[in-house]
């Protein structure tokens, strides 16, 4: 689907899908792009399906990489025939599909495989190169690498996104790395080991440079690269890694930085040292930090599911009243 769309607008790669390509892609799917100053804060884009207009923030209100991904994700919903989600599982599934579509649109498979193949020949595969060549976010580049590298090059891989405290937002693997999980196997909100690259990157002398590290674990030794994304102000860690055996194909595999993790053994990093327990148990009373960012996109209405969780629909409808499009509002007062 993305290949046909890109060919239709004249993109033949390799390299960045241009702004003109994106505008033409929107038209190919039957939409016009409109950049506005007053998009509601709770929405990344608003689509008027009656007038076939997709509203996105002005360039000065969002980074160009962010704006490109928002356009591509929005087009993905329509290209894939998504309907209003009926429950939260449906909503999440549609988001995942639209995000994958966006990655495939902005970093086309054939072009990405060409870049990765050339880099593999030099032992220099890097997420950063995809980030720069295709002008996409580091996280999207990391997802695209992990989408394609096992299928095309038989290299096992894992991906993590975590916050400065090590709490996982997203993670998946096919290389056997031991991801933390609760009794039900849920990984979101679990804390990664203190000695993993995703945590150690924040402790390094230059925490905003790429952090390369080998970590010995109960499942084997893994090489990882961690990048700290500062967009949004919190500074989340995006980590990609593979087994020690396959690290030779990646830039940064020559690092001498090594650590050992004994997790899930609680004595590794989850339990405080016995001496500290003896000194302070019973007299320490911390107040937990609010981790509201984990639930900011979740539905807050306990009575009924909202098809667009986290979005203030009053603001959305007010916005559309201000931007009625050429056909005007569907039901004028």
Language-model regions, residue ranges each:
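Short juxta-domain linker segments that transition from a proline/glycine-rich
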Residues: 1-333
């Amino acid at each position: 689907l993305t290949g046909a769309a890109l060919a239709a607008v004249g993109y033949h790669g390799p390299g960045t899908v241009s702004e003109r390509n994106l505008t033409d892609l929107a038209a190919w799917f039957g939409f016009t792009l409109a950049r506005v100053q007053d998009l509601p804060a709770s929405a990344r884009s608003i689509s008027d399906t009656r007038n076939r207009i997709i509203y996105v923030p002005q360039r000065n209100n969002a980074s160009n990489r962010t704006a490109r991904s928002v356009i591509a994700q929005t087009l993905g919903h329509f290209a894939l025939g998504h309907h209003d989600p009926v429950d939260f599982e449906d909503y999440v599934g549609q988001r995942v599909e639209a995000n994958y579509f966006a990655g495939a649109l902005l970093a086309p498979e054939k072009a990405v495989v060409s870049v990765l193949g050339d880099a593999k020949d030099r032992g220099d595969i890097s997420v950063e190169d995809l980030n720069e060549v295709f002008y996409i976010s580091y996280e999207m580049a990391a997802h695209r690498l992990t989408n394609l590298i096992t299928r095309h090059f038989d290299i096992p891989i894992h991906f993590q996104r975590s916050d400065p405290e090590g709490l996982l937002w997203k993670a998946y693997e096919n290389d056997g790395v031991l991801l933390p999980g609760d009794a039900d196997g849920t990984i979101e909100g679990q804390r990664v080991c203190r000695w993993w690259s995703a945590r150690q990157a924040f402790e390094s002398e230059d925490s905003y440079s790429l952090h390369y590290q080998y970590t010995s674990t109960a499942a084997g030794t893994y090489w990882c690269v961690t990048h700290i994304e500062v967009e949004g102000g919190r500074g989340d860690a995006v980590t990609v890694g593979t087994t020690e055996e396959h690290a030779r194909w990646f830039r940064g595999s020559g690092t001498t930085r090594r650590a050992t993790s004994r997790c899930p053994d609680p004595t590794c990093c989850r339990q405080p040292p016995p001496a500290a327990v003896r000194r302070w148990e019973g007299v320490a009373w911390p107040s937990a930090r609010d981790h509201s960012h984990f639930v900011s996109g979740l539905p807050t209405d306990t009575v009924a599911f909202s098809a667009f969780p986290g979005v203030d629909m009053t603001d959305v409808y007010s916005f559309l009243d201000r931007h009625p499009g050429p056909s005007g509002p569907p039901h004028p007062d």
